[in-house]
């Protein structure tokens, strides 16, 4: 009788475990979809002004350099926000969900203030800086929340998240092509989307089963991130990637407009092409994430950077040539330039201290975006001197440095795996 009761108890426990596993599996896919949608909507603020720069330049009588500051201000604001967040360990000591929702809504308000009240470059740069600073609470916390739901398939999950971010940053170009001819209306629509994204995370997303209790504030964690050699190499790869990425995202649409205009194509075609090129990164991110979970993060990141680096060298020679040829090279560049992005973050979540994962991700992002301010500022200066034909070649050293860093990380991980096998044999 006791044996029968024991057997029934074991079967009941097994059924309960199976039910819990099914619930967790459904929960993680629900979280993936909701976070991806929220990230897409929240990060639509990033290029909301860049997409309408031609109209702003005309209205405010801005130079090319002045218009560039509207994008650069977002980068600088993001750097300031991520640095403050990392120093205070914000993503680890408070709810990442609440941080995401609060900063998405604050960023939306700063963006709306730009649309409603900005009338000159000084006010515009200040409000774009605030927008970037608040977006520092959207991207890294989103990655942390996603990591609490995924261990198996984390590369794919983070790839989906970065892909959604990429589509979000591309979306203002689509709105500009299809939406109102009034740039202020288009920017306000981006603010509305960001608020919806913040509310989605606050109301419908929960932390996953791999979440850890809130950590204690420890400013030393900022320095400890670089004591871990694996994390350090992953960060170096990320820095090479970032040297290229945002300068390409910022200035390739400008180059497409100029090249299409030189061939007599309609302006709306350049806007659609810009959306397609930047949006192609979403496909690249998801594809790279799926591959990375199968063959490894370091080789996939290396392949992506090798391809995007080749596009840096080639794209300028397509300027003012056939729009179709330029678009083909640009779409390949758009798909590969961001494909590796999530894998650097995945490496940090897997190789670093899980208790301070949010701090490590935020610091990685902060330093990477600080580097982008240099390359973004460099490209227009080169265009004035050597033209579009050669300007983007200056971005190629970034992916080259990234490939070298990833190959060194691959070598270290292989050595660590071999040592682990030897210990198990002994």
List the predicted regions and their residue ranges.
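Extracytoplasmic gate region of multi-pass secondary transporters
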Residues: 49-53, 230-282, 345, 375-376
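Hydrophobic core of transmembrane alpha-helices in multi-pass small-molecule transporters
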Residues: 40, 110, 122-137, 323-339
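Flexible cytoplasmic inter-helical loops of multi-pass small-molecule transporters
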Residues: 203-227, 416-423
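Helix-loop-helix hairpin linking two adjacent transmembrane segments in secondary transporters
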Residues: 152, 160-205
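Intracellular juxtamembrane helix-capping segments at the cytosolic ends
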Residues: 137-150, 339-353
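Conserved MFS/SLC helix-loop-helix module at the cytosolic interface between two early adjacent transmembrane helices
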Residues: 82-120, 292
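C-terminal transmembrane helical hairpin of 12-TM major facilitator-type secondary transporters
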Residues: 295-347
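Cytoplasmic helix-loop-helix junction between adjacent transmembrane helices
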Residues: 127-164
């Amino acid at each position: 009788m006791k044996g029968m009761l024991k057997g029934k108890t074991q079967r009941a426990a097994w059924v309960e475990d199976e039910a819990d596993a099914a619930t967790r599996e459904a929960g993680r896919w629900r979280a993936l979809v909701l976070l991806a949608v929220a990230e897409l909507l929240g990060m639509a603020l990033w290029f909301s002004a860049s997409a309408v720069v031609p109209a702003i330049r005309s209205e405010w009588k801005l130079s090319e350099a002045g218009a560039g500051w509207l994008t650069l201000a977002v980068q600088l604001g993001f750097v300031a926000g991520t640095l403050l967040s990392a120093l205070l360990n914000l993503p680890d000591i408070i709810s990442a969900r609440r941080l995401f929702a609060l900063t998405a809504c604050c960023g939306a308000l700063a963006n709306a203030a730009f649309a409603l009240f900005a009338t000159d470059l000084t006010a515009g740069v200040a409000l774009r800086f605030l927008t970037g600073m608040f977006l520092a609470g959207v991207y890294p916390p989103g990655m942390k929340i996603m990591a609490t739901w995924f261990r198996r398939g984390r590369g794919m999950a983070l790839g989906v998240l970065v892909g959604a971010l990429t589509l979000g940053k591309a979306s203002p170009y689509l709105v500009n092509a299809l939406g109102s001819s009034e740039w202020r209306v288009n920017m306000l629509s981006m603010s509305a989307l960001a608020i919806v994204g913040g509310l989605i995370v606050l109301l419908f997303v929960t932390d996953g089963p791999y979440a850890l209790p809130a950590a204690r504030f420890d400013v030393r964690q900022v320095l400890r991130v670089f004591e871990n050699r694996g994390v350090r190499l992953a960060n170096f790869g990320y820095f090479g990637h970032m040297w290229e990425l945002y300068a390409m995202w910022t200035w390739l649409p400008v180059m497409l407009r100029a090249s299409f205009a030189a061939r007599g194509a309609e302006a709306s075609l350049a806007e659609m092409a810009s959306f397609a090129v930047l949006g192609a990164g979403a496909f690249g991110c998801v594809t790279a994430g799926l591959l990375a979970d199968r063959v490894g993060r370091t080789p996939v990141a290396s392949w992506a950077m090798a391809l995007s680096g080749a596009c840096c060298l080639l794209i300028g020679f397509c300027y003012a040539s056939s729009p179709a040829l330029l678009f083909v090279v640009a779409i390949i560049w758009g798909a590969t330039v961001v494909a590796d992005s999530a894998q650097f973050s995945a490496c940090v979540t897997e190789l670093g201290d899980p208790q301070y994962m949010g701090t490590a991700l935020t610091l990685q992002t902060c330093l990477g975006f600080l580097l982008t301010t240099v390359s973004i500022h460099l490209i227009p200066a080169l265009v004035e001197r050597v033209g579009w034909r050669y300007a983007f070649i200056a971005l190629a050293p970034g992916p080259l440095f990234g490939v070298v860093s990833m190959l060194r990380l691959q070598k270290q991980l292989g050595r660590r795996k071999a040592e682990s096998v030897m210990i198990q044999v002994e």
